[in-house]
Amino acid sequence: PFYGYYWTEDGKYILYAKDKDGDENLNIFAVSPNEKVAAGKLPKSRNLTPMKDVAAQIYATSKKNPDVLMIGVNDRDKAWHDLYRLTISTGKLELMYENKDRITGYDFDWDDNLRVLYQTDEKGNTQFLYKNGDALTPIYETSVTEQASISGWNEDNSKFYLITNKGELNLTTLYLMDPVTKELTYIESDPKKKVDFGGLSLDRNTRKIISTSYTADKTVYFWRDKTWEENYNFLQQKFPGREVDFQS
């Protein structure tokens, strides 16, 4: 089966992960939808990680170079994924981080710099480790019953948007966190105090917030970008009674 798909930033390739006969050993494939093929035929897929008995996974598509992916491959240690930089056009793999620290995830800023790593212990507690040079500094921690995730960076890459329900919070809330000072600045939570924070949409060109959203019986958007709001309202008028969403 397939395990999700991505478009590259330039729309040149569709990327997807796939195993063989349900064995859960995943490879990453690329297909060019614009490739010229005979009528009734499909473009040929390329296996970018032609290794046996591995579970490769895509962590991020590059925001600066559409020919680059950040992926994880557990070829060295089956329990943990090392971080690689993959060049789509050539299949070249470059090791970015050898995972000997129980790292379960990686987060990159707007310039594709590795900034935060997620480390999980045997009890299910998770630490956010801030990367400064070769040093990894713990900056945030959640227990197994709490949630926290990074949902992008601010305009100058100095702070990240954190969605969390740590501590006495009943519902997930959006904050802006400074990884150096560890200071949290409240941004937003559900005005009706009924549902978790739903989603944050950021403009990849301006790096500013487009909208936030919350989902109960339907999804409600709070717009900060007038142009996007106008586009949304136009589509709502075209499809009355339907829910409209943007995907990228």
Task: Please place each PLM-identified region on the residue numbering.
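Peripheral, non-catalytic segments that deliver or gate enzyme domains
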Residues: 1-3, 9-248
